[in-house]
Each structure stands twice: as structure tokens, then as C-alpha cells.
Amino acid sequence: PLGIDPRSCDTGNVIIIAGELKMVSQTVRHQGARLIIASTRRLAADQLDSRIKSLNYLNQIMARIEANEAGADEAVVLNQAGFVAEGTADNIFIVKGGILLTPPVTDCALDGITRNIILDIADKLSIPAEEKSITPFDVFTADECFLTGTGAELIPVREVVGRHIRQA
């Protein structure tokens, strides 16, 4: 019914959606992004494993709408337990007390390519790094914060919900 029964698919289909790719502005790259904490939550891992790229971006779209309406550049999406999961299309890192922190995949963070590169570089440079559950308060009180993504690369964060991030 409704075309969602996989047994009714005799052959595979390829769908390509092409549109203008809008990258992060140079202003945001130089001045830093302004973030909000979205009220829209990330689906729980037992509902939709964050490692599955299913193109089901409804929660991220809803969070992005919240960011747009708030005049922010991006939204931080929390998981069902209230821990930081990720941005709408990027991973989040904070630096606190000299330690680089990012949410673990078990907190519904995307196991992103750029995220893993950052963790590998930190390891090679002997920079203390941990995958650890992060609260919104941890982000508010971070010494530094940045976002990563394949298209976004690395984006500094200057404020979260109007609170300025201290720069080390």
C-alpha cells in the first residue's frame, strides 16, 4: 500500500535532485556562526539510527526553520534525552578546559567524515579529545565551539542563544 512495501519494488530507482548548493557565507566563516538550541529533537537511535543516510531530514528541516525564524545561522539539535546530538547538517565540537569534545554516535550524532578527520588530527597532534555526552550548558560555557561537515568544512561559532562563546 502507498508504495512503501519493499516487496513491490521489482527494480531499483535512482532519483537525483539537483539544486544550487549554498555554502556558508564568508561573513559567517570570519565572524563565526550564531546558533540556537532547537526545540525539535533528533529521532532516537531506536527510531532511526543516525548512521543510516535515508534522506529523512524532516527533523533537521524543522530545526533549520527555527534557526531561520530566530535570525540564527544554525540550530543545535538535541537528542531525546536532552543531550547535544548535532547541527542540522553538521557535527558540533566544543573545547572545554583544553579538551576537545564532541557528542558520541550513541547520542545520535552523525558519524561524519569531517568529524572523524578532526578526531584523527587531534590524536596525531596529541590534543586531548573525547566523544562525550554534551549538555546545552556545556556549550554555553565552552571555551570554544565549532561545527564541521563535508560541505561546511569547519565553521567557528561565536554565540549560542545570544551567549558569546569565549575564545581561548
Residue ranges and their predicted role:
Residues L2-A168:
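Helix-start/capping segments and mature chain N-termini
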